[in-house]
């Protein structure tokens, strides 16, 4: 049976920015490596972090799950990565896209950019673009590395190599600034990736988390579990007055009263803070809470009958 956490929900949503900052720091503990221009090579690299965080970031504490998956799939002896897939499925079942909203460094980076005071644009008319990330997951993360191989049977990590802006932000830029040899070796591929990063930065100022909505394969994978994950959104229909404030507050274009566990919901909690009746909260566990609500209603009815 799932449990609702109304008070905790309010607190988590209010301090989400601090939680994101802490998660980013934990994901990138080895900060002195930025000055050294070196990569962390410890045992932590054998474990994947939950969010999108480049393996080549000097400070990273672990491996990027998308990069690690491509490395295994694209190896000369092709094998499906059961460890990484199992790890991602576990996270998907436990948390769903809560990871996107609270634990992903690149998601937080986009949110910080969106705080820059300029005119903001809505993405409600661009909903078709949200399906692009599933194509990126299937084609660039799995199919191309697995089947487009060189003479020795190895495939490139296509997403990391040609599309991921996080690799440039956390990896190529800091490493090239600290290491003249790397700086001298930068070529057309870096220029291409850098232009993608600049585009994402510009779009993030205008749109809320555009990369997360349209292109992130990790978000696409976690989205597959949003409706069945243990961490979910709960709307108390008895408290809801249908004012629509939660839907207007949602920057992921989700109406939590209609689809509380929509694939685009990142559990950011903006709807929780916007609700004047405190009808929206986080819920963790199995079930939808209806049995517990029905039991409480029955108990109240029995008590009323006794009083009469």
Language-model region placement:
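Non-ligating segments of multi-cofactor redox enzymes
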Residues: 1-257, 263-308
């Amino acid at each position: 049976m799932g449990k609702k956490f109304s008070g905790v929900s309010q607190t988590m949503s209010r301090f989400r920015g601090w939680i994101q900052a802490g998660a980013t720091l934990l994901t990138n503990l080895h900060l002195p490596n930025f000055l050294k221009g070196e990569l962390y090579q410890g045992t932590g690299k054998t474990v994947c972090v939950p969010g999108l965080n480049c393996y080549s970031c000097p400070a990273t504490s672990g491996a990027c799950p998308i990069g690690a998956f491509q490395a295994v799939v694209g190896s000369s002896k092709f094998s499906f990565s059961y460890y990484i897939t199992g790890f991602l499925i576990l996270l998907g079942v436990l948390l769903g896209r809560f990871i996107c909203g609270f634990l992903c460094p690149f998601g937080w980076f986009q949110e910080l950019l969106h705080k820059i005071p300029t005119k903001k644009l809505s993405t409600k008319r661009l909903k078709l673009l949200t399906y692009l990330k599933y194509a990126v997951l299937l084609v660039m993360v799995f199919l191309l590395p697995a089947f487009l191989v060189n003479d020795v049977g190895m495939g490139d990590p296509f997403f990391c190599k040609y599309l991921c802006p996080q690799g440039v932000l956390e990896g190529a830029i800091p490493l090239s600034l600290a290491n003249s040899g790397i700086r001298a070796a930068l070529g057309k591929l870096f220029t291409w990736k850098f232009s993608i990063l600049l585009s994402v930065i510009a779009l993030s100022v205008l749109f809320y988390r555009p990369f997360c909505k349209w292109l992130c394969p990790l978000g696409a994978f976690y989205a597959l579990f949003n409706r069945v994950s243990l961490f979910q959104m709960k709307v108390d229909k008895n408290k809801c007055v249908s004012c629509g404030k939660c839907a207007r507050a949602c920057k992921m274009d989700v109406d939590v009263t209609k689809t509380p566990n929509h694939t685009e919901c990142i559990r950011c909690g903006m709807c929780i803070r916007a609700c004047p009746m405190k009808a929206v909260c986080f819920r963790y566990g199995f079930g939808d809470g209806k049995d517990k609500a029905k039991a409480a209603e029955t108990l109240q009815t029995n008590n009323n009958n006794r009083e009469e």
